[in-house]
Amino acid sequence: ELVGTGVALGLLPGGTGNLLARNLGGVVDSLEEAATIAFTGQDRRIDVGWLVIDPTQEQRSGLPRAAPNVHCFTVMAGLGFDAQMMADAPEGVKDKVGWAAYVASGGKHLNDAPFSLELTVDGRPVLRRKTRTVVVGNCGELTGGMVLLPDASIDDGRLDVATVSPESLTQWIGVAARVLANRDDGPALERESGRDITVSVHPPQLCEVDGDVLAEATNLRFVVQPRALAVRVVR
């Protein structure tokens, strides 16, 4: 609701707020310090992303208007393995062990079947293949401190997208090693960036925004709204 208003968002420790604060160099472990920043810090304008699930013809261009199938995100959105991992992490376990809960839930889906993907960036078809997950990020550092999208910047007017397509446990390990070592793309990890990203998948895949699991979808549109949100950060 603060997008486009100029009213600043204050970040308090917990959930997606932690991820956003971490990407902004903020406080993630002290409620008192975070509250002080929220009241006395300076404003920084950041981009926001919009996810449109199964867009209508009108929703295929321009910034989307408020609608039941339109969702805002500040950190990331994803589908496939990414969303299944979020969906299967029990709330009680997340409260106790944090991001490690996603590791446990992710293990259940390592052998899920891949899905067919067509990826278009700024009107340009860039990828058509079988894949396991798609992550679209407004910033680079994700859960557990992993930098999946090293070129992402929260105020560059672009979204970054990663497709992860391992065909075996060995390739899963290879993807993890590549991400942790901040290495270039490989056969099971491909990254792009743009302002307007469309994804078509078959069969339909579960999707999420900022860790909130939504519905299954076949066609998804991700679009950036540059510098649309003011966030209170350290002076």
Task: Describe every region a protein language model picked out.
Residues 82-85, 127-129, 142-145, 169-173:
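Short acidic/glycine-rich loop or secondary-structure boundary segments that cap or lie
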Residues 118, 129-130, 135-137, 160-164:
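Short, conserved beta-strand edge motifs with alternating hydrophobic and charged residues
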